[in-house]
């Protein structure tokens, strides 16, 4: 029950803050995608799609989850598979598994939303329409591509045709300008959105940055370059320090990112980065105003759109 206990603790925290928790299966038995870094796929073992046993385990897992949380009002929904990416012609096998999971969930829980991601990292819904449940949402992800006014035209007709909500369930890994433009696009089309991730280790593009401690860096060096192997105790201490650094109060808060996501999509106004600047005095270059490019600051390289353009642009 260790995994369930973690979810229970999260729900206990979320309830007084009136925050919904969406359960998203990132590592299905065998792995739902070829990307080993996010789906735990092992090329030497059968994937989710190559093993009936793995499929049955996935169905049983979701039924067990639904049995436990069927009456919890702070579960926002069940996101059945995160970013499946496999050769699944016509989406037949993907839909078949989704329907099996949905049926298993509905045996014990007829209340919570079923969230369906497309193939190819949640962006290919071939074979996944029409919806097979009356309480279903289609969820796509968006990374590193353009944010023009017509960039959701590939998926908006699916919502209108089938009268089913859309949710942009994951995005991020870009610049503040891209964040503002993307949120503006979603909200102009009444598409809900969620960002990844709230906290990241050593990141410059998440609201909270987790500091890397010296011991953890030694572990990374050992894994990556074959550096000196840390002792078991040193490794344990480093990981516990990293866990402590991950507490919100110990993170570096990047309020410019929150501002780009929550305020800037709705205004051209700029606001001071700090309210304590005084002249005469020192104003650091990095403390430019919070606001959009060409308003709070001026920059030529403001985002990367390499999924659309085919070439990567370093924005930072």
Question: Where are the language model's segments positioned?
Answer:
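Generic secondary-structure boundary/loop-capping signal
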Residues: 45-46, 140, 195, 280, ...
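Aromatic-rich peripheral "rim/lid" segments of glycoside hydrolase catalytic domains that contact
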Residues: 178-181, 185-278, 302
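Extracellular glycoside hydrolase catalytic/binding regions
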Residues: 59-63, 67-200, 205-220
């Amino acid at each position: 029950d260790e995994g369930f206990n973690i979810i229970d603790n999260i729900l206990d925290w979320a309830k007084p803050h009136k925050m919904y928790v969406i359960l998203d299966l990132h590592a299905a038995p065998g792995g739902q995608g070829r990307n080993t870094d996010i789906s735990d796929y092992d090329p030497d073992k059968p994937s989710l799609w190559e093993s009936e046993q793995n499929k049955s385990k996935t169905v049983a897992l979701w039924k067990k989850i639904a049995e436990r949380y069927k009456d919890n009002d702070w579960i926002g929904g069940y996101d059945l598979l995160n970013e499946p990416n496999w050769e699944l012609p016509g989406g037949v096998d993907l839909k078949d598994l989704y329907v099996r999971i949905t049926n298993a969930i509905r045996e014990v829980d007829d209340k919570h939303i079923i969230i369906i991601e497309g193939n190819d990292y949640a962006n290919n819904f071939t074979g996944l329409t029409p919806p097979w449940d009356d309480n279903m949402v289609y969820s796509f992800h968006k990374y590193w591509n353009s944010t023009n006014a017509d960039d959701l035209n590939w998926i908006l007709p699916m919502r209108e045709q089938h009268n089913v909500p859309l949710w942009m369930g994951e995005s991020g890994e870009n610049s503040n300008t891209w964040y503002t433009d993307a949120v503006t696009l979603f909200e102009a089309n009444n598409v809900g959105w969620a960002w990844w991730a709230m906290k990241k280790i050593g990141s410059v593009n998440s609201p909270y940055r987790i500091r890397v401690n010296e011991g953890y860096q030694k572990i990374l060096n050992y894994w990556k370059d074959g550096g000196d192997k840390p002792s078991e105790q040193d490794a344990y201490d480093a990981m516990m320090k990293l866990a402590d650094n991950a507490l919100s109060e110990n993170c570096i808060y990047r309020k410019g990112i929150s501002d780009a996501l929550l305020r800037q999509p709705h205004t051209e106004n700029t606001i001071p980065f700090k309210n304590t600047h005084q002249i005469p005095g020192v104003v650091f270059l990095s403390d430019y105003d919070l606001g959009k490019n060409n308003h709070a600051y001026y920059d030529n390289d403001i985002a990367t759109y390499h999924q659309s353009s085919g070439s990567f642009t370093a924005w930072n």
